[in-house]
Amino acid sequence: IGSEIHLVKVDDPYYNESKNLPEVKKVMETLKSQILDDPTKTILIASTNRAQAGLIQDELDRLRNKDKVINDYISSHKGELDKLLVMNLETVQGEERDIVIISTVYGPDANGVVANRFGDLVRSGGERRLNVLLTRAKEKVYLVTSLNSGDIRVSPGAVTGKRYLKDYLSFAETGIISDTLVRESGEPENDFERAIMNAIKQRGYEVDAQIGCLNYRIDLAIKDPRDTSRY
């Protein structure tokens, strides 16, 4: 794994209508702590859905008007490559920062029940979008979550965003990495990789992009024609 992963559990979480306000507050605490630790680091805050990202942005705007630490940090990081960003699963592609704070959003409702519904993560391509989100950090990830990996129920053998989140949480909890994370493929990172990939395909080979484990990846891998489960 290329980046450090710090698991940050939310006290008294409450997930309701695609939002988790206690988790937003924990994200802000984590942000301020990181700024105090090293204000030179660039930071991205990302959530797994749009509604939570909007709530985080609103809370950040509110705190900026009353918290000197956060206001000074934002004021001193205004460049396109170092400004503080708040993004979601759909918009984070192409962005990178030293530190990424991730809000997983989902969690128990008012009755303490975690519904097995995970929005965009269960839709087609959810695992690829989540992989992009999880690999935006150059140095460190804070995984702010109201979930335990055991809260997420998946079908045996299924490779979906939900499975990917479960395995990532499990890795953060135990340090043990699953085959899902090791063998996950993604999309080419740039036009050069895409051109090379297309040229290889034109020669009759099957090829996957961004093979590997989170931040530790091989750009392109050609499948063995005699055994396509190997490269």
Segments from the language model and where they lie:
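Conserved helicase/translocase motor-coupling segment
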Residues: 1-61
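Generic beta-strand/beta-sheet core signal
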Residues: 8-10, 46-48, 87-89, 102-105, ...
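Short, glycine-/Ser/Thr-/acidic-enriched flexible segments
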Residues: 12-13, 50-52, 91, 106-108, ...
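Helicase C-terminal subdomain and adjacent C-terminal extension
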Residues: 60, 64, 111-214, 219-221
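Short glycine-/polar-rich loops that comprise or flank the Walker A/P-loop
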Residues: 2-3, 82, 96-99, 137-141
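Conserved motor-coupling elements within RecA-like helicase/translocase cores
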Residues: 69-100
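A short beta-strand element within the Helicase C-terminal
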Residues: 95-107, 112-115, 141-142
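Active-site beta-strand-loop-beta-strand hairpin of nuclease catalytic cores
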Residues: 221-231
